[in-house]
């Protein structure tokens, strides 16, 4: 709630900022800036505030798409890792390798693969500008993020699968339930608490995404893959620590709202009640 330091045109010295109220929040939310004449007007092009809502859209787009893909792929990987086999331990170790690799290394790896002369364009037979075309760059980041964090989802879902008693599946087999019926009426309801925890963790992590798009594509605030976290870092680099703190508060409120909605309406308690109902329906 404090103004940032600014240069006094009369003395040429930096002066301390005073109480700003909600000025910083209005700066980000409404793109309103103080003009040279002291009036408040629309921020000109190039000001960070003009990139706020585009970065919010990009962040939410990344979150929805990556979490959805990682959930579907994570369930499949967890089912494979939970299936009894001689190489189950080897499969589990191999699946977790992408998650164990540092994000910076992952970003550079995929950056090389998506280069104009990289392996991706060679396999596709087309010269796609993955790092400059807006939508191609976004999908490149999504692919890299899904490859990196799907094992995390699979690990949490696997923990839920291992909590399901084996005799439940035996009873379903005796009753003549098909594989699809077993999955939809037993596996999915009983694993839902762990699944919702995995989705919650990944959603919160995706909302604060920063290093992957910065290293792969660009750290600029007007990049097609710029997230909200990038604006915070860029604002701090310009010395605007108070407005950057206000933006960090807005990010916190966004993450808190998403977490509250997911816990309140899609929490483990709801999943547990639905799971018990599903178990009664299979008997």
Task: Provide a role label for each language-model segment.
Residues 1-283:
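A structural signal for multi-pass alpha-helical bundles of membrane permease subunits
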